[in-house]
Amino acid sequence: MALKEKEFGHYAKRIDYTKVSGNLDLPNLIEIQTETYDWFKKTGISEVFREVFPIVGHEGNIVLEMLDWEFREPRRTISQAKDESKIFEAPIYSNLKLTINSKDVEVEKAIVKGEPELIKAWIEERVGHMITILKKTTDVIYYDIHSGDEIATCTVTIKERLDDKLIVDITIEKEGEVFFGDFPLMTGKGTFIVNGSEKVVVSQLVRSPGAYYKIDLNRKNGENVYYVDLIPSRGTWLEFESDHKKIKVGKEEKFENVFYVKIDKSRKVSVANFLTALGIIKEDALDIFGDNKLVKSTYELDPYTGDILYDQSIAVQEIYKKIRSGETATPDGATKYLYGLLFDKRKYDLTKAGRFKLIQKLSVENRIYNKILAEDIKDVNGKVVFTEGTLMDKEAINKLKGILKAGACLQEVKFSDEIICSNKIQKIKVYVDNEVRSRVANIIGIDPNATDEYVTVPDVLATFSYLLNLTDGIGEVDDIDHLGNRRVRTIGELLQNQFRIGLLRIEKNVKEKMSTSNLFKMKPSNIINNKPLSAIIGEFFNLSQLSQFMDQTNPLAELTNKRRLTALGPGGLSRERAGLEVRDVHYSHYGRICPIETPEGPNIGLINNLATYAKINSYGFIETPYRRVIGCKVTMENDYLTADEEKNYVVAQANIRLSDKGEILDEQVVARFQGENIIAGRNDVDYVDVSPKQIVSIATSCIPFLENDDANRALMGANMQRQAIPLIAPNSPYVGTGVEYAAARDSGLAIVSQYDGIVDFVDATRIVLKTKEGLKNYNLDTFVRSNQGTSLTHVPLVRQGQKVEKGQVLADGPSIDKGELALGQNVVVAFTTWNGYNYEDAIIVSERLVSEDVFTSIHIEEYTIERRQTKQGPEEITREIPNISENARKFLDDDGLVIIGTEVKPGDILVGKVTPKGQTQLSPEDKLLQAIFGEKSKNVKDNSLRVPNGGEGIIQAIKRFPREKYEVSADVLEVIKIYIVQKRKIQEGDKMAGRHGNKGVISKILPLEDMPHMEDGTPVDIMLNPLGVPSRMNIGQVLEIHLGMAAKKLGQKISTPVFDGMINEELIEIMDKAGMKNFGKEVLIDGRTGEKFDNPVSVGVMYMLKLSHMVDDKLHARNVGPYSLITQQPLGGKAQNGGQRFGEMEVWALEAYGAAHTLREILTIKSDDIKGRTRAYESIVKDKKIPEPGIPESFNVLTREIQGLGFNIHMIDEKGNIKNIKSYDEADYVDEDLLTDCDEFEDEFDIDNFILSTNREPQKKEHLEDFVKVEDSFDLVDNLDDNELDDIDNEIDEINDQDELS
């Protein structure tokens, strides 16, 4: 077979093994983010403004209208926002018009003035601005109000002229521009910059608004119980359900199914009462629902109250009592409340998706499929289209749709005049049983042309009708996990919801101000306060579960983060309540949600990823493309279908056999229909998959030979590719799948040209393109820190003078090689054991990978320090730091900042900072220090920024943000950021993995000469344990090494797409062509002994990744560190400088060994025995025997908790004497024996040694005299009597007690 080469982008070529021709190109992979945000900016904001405005005051005399609005230019660029740790945002401004109407205003007449002047003076006094008369007629005068920037006019209509006054109507109109706050902008790659970090808003998968039916079994009587939930996006839930109750029919009592409704999860209300409350009388209800015994039994008797309430006002009040338990209301109040809950557009939101779902579920044509008509159906002109007795098959239903869309079968329904909504229902009668045509069912549907985004009375009737039909076996229950019933709330919709909440809060504030403010001095700018909107938006981006710190480890991680779907978050599921059904793979996920890629932990199945070709439609439902089949011929037309639409079609697989003309060759093919796999005739096929890879996500489709891997390992492989760290010399894989180019291009980390043009200039920092629109600049990143601390660096691919096309990659980003994704390295792998060093998935690697920097990565860490204004004065950045030797300051420049390029170690000073100290009474020791070191040590404290443990590296950059030039927090004078870059070679303890879930930790790095080598002398790079393959069933890695070796020998890179790639025969063929024998096994020779291994070993080229679980980040040591305040036990974890927890199971291990003394030591003086650990420390310092342990603090915590429960608890010694626990609490921590006597201290104190130990010389001669004064002060202690000493002790105790309290 001739090998065909295919170009991927403009630089990479691969031998392509794709079988399915006419594959659809992958769409823009981040359009789920960019397109919906564009919709929000262009349409979403306008929709919310239209909902809220105009705002009318409570009395109706003040109206605030929205004229227009706009986004202005952003306040700062993306790079400035990152550097300054600010938000990349733009201000929203709007033009508002305020109209104030004052009716029947009395204006007292003055003697000299005419009417226009009189009214002018009266208005000027109240408005506070000069006004000019513009125009006047007999009864109407027009004025212009001079009020600064705003346009303000006044119209006065004289209604009545009395002797002493005028009665006038005044209308004042003011127009002005109002600032509505700053709004975060999306960058071109689908992210937001919030506080300097890139964030992504993840799309949410939630239950769609609509009507959902289910049937349960009543275990008491074996009867079916029928339920329906009518769920809005926002507003009141309606739940109908059936119940088996005893009812009276005349004198006779019998059990019947009766129907109830719950309004917003309240107590049950009879459906009869509910319909009566809506103004539908019993006769009309029986006419609508037909001769149905369930409806009749529901109307017979309300078993809860004992009677049926046919009066509307009584029914409304009864329902009100059930909803608002314990409250009473007038009939008018109850009616207003009930109708407000259900039919008020502002309180109830069904959304476009909810209306779409209701029409889809409740429309008549979808419910009478395969039923026989019990009446004639006429079109709008009265012509009979279907006669009674017609079987409604697929063809008849398609014909009926058009007739119903035109308005046939509609009838009006009567209900309360106070409910303003559509009053049209569709009604068709069919026979319940096609064979025995005795009973007739009324199918009540809603108008297919309805557009209301709130529930209407016809919706309620059709919903209840469906439930009644379900009891007759007409209709079907809903599968809540079906993707037809779950929709995606994208970034645009999520932001629109937040914007609506903020604007509604502003509306509430405006209405309050309209009622309380001075009527005439009111203007748009002073009644709008934008803080509620800014607060809501800020809270969403900073605190929402859906606004996530972007995973920027590599391009694939970034891309996957943007395409993620979560069922968690506000309005979604919770981890604890989500069952197995909602987490499981569903047949409707095919082509829409990846069945492989999901987290392994408690979020499994709740966080998913979009499949490669999936799109979100305008209703929020996920669509996937299929190629249309017309008369057995597969066309090139692609239709995007939702899960609901797809179930009505027969869909065949992409890899069916086709002729050159695209005709299906086989008479029968495997296909899917209504969620089942079937064998279909070729004439029955409606659609064909566009590509075999449409079932999986981008990360999963990067795994070659995926079809040969177990699903669990494929899941790990997909997840671990996202953890691969960018290496300094990325290499794309020899064995790829063909999606590497699209993934890299759309990730946002490659620089892609937006224009056709010629490269005018190129260097490491920017590329300039000459285009028809002029010169276009593309700035390149060099050593920029990502969110995860990896290095973002762009490498140009174009040369000066080169022609480029729109969409061409101009520069590679991290983990990108010639425009293709390159997460790891191609290395020679042998599946063999070696002295037990690769036991349990451990990995042995060659020293070549270290010395040649094959797996070396660059990491950048940012350290920030602030210079603040304190109460004692401003902090200073300086080189002059008290008590610091010259050697410790050797890397600092004159300003006190570390010099760029310096190699620093933990503990080194990065920025010298001193903070002023408050003036207090100095102790003799402080006076001594002050005398030695002068004024500086007296006034300031060292608060310098130092390199933390594990933070060693080279200073890469320093950025300063002084208050004079940048926005900084209050009390901050300057912010300084230091960037330290680390070059990390691969080492023992680092985690590595392949693409098939084959992960392991490096256990040994062998010298090159010790590694086994092939007969031609080529040493292997990595040795993996062969036992890692059979039990894991990820055979793809074995096929990959054989194909990788063949590709390396041929010098060709290969593309083998998932489910559509190379078959075994082709693999054998290419291995033969590359000269590989023995099925890819090689004779290996031990590098140490020169002897051959007993058997040939599988050797080949595998693509290996270095993962972001490096031993450098995990290694941690602690001597004495922080302790927990309550339990006094050491903190845990590296971040808290804590220790390793010696937990319950570790205690069992020591108990099993009988190591009693070690165990006692660990549980007391090494942990929370406060007195004991103090004494032990003292003993170690003085080289004495370690004392006996005391009482652990956790024992005291336990006793206090028991005392808190009201128990009196005592401690009893061996003799039975009661000991006071409190005395143990208040005992001194240090034993009196350990206190040093003043005389001993005086004898041991040596001034000369003290000076030497400080590494400082006395600055002045007088300082030596101060030492003598201090020495003399120790003599004073000897001269004090016992009482005076006791007084001093008491004062010291009081000070210590105060310190403990504080």
Curated annotation (Swiss-Prot):
Entry GO MF terms: DNA binding; DNA-directed RNA polymerase activity; ribonucleoside binding
Domain of life assignment: Bacteria
Pfam families (UniProt xref): RNA_pol_Rpb2_1, RNA_pol_Rpb2_2, RNA_pol_Rpb2_3, RNA_pol_Rpb2_45, RNA_pol_Rpb2_6, RNA_pol_Rpb2_7
Keyword Transcription in annotation: yes
Assigned GO CC terms: DNA-directed RNA polymerase complex
InterPro entries: DNA-dir_RNA_pol_bsu_ext_1_sf, DNA-dir_RNA_pol_bsu_external_1, DNA-dir_RNA_pol_su2, DNA-dir_RNAP_su2_dom, DNA-dir_RNAP_su2_hyb_sf, RNA_pol_bsu_bac, RNA_pol_bsu_CS, RNA_pol_bsu_protrusion
Catalytic activity as recorded in UniProt: RNA(n) + a ribonucleoside 5'-triphosphate = RNA(n+1) + diphosphate
Alphabetical keyword list: DNA-directed RNA polymerase, Nucleotidyltransferase, Transcription, Transferase
Documented EC number(s): 2.7.7.6
Swiss-Prot/TrEMBL GO biological process terms: DNA-templated transcription
Class of this enzyme: transferase
Function summary: DNA-dependent RNA polymerase catalyzes the transcription of DNA into RNA using the four ribonucleoside triphosphates as substrates.
Subunit description: The RNAP catalytic core consists of 2 alpha, 1 beta, 1 beta' and 1 omega subunit. When a sigma factor is associated with the core the holoenzyme is formed, which can initiate transcription.
Family label: Belongs to the RNA polymerase beta chain family.
Alphabetical list of PANTHER family matching this protein: DNA-DIRECTED RNA POLYMERASE I SUBUNIT 2
Name of the protein in question: DNA-directed RNA polymerase subunit beta
Organism of provenance: Spiroplasma citri
Gene giving rise to this polypeptide: rpoB
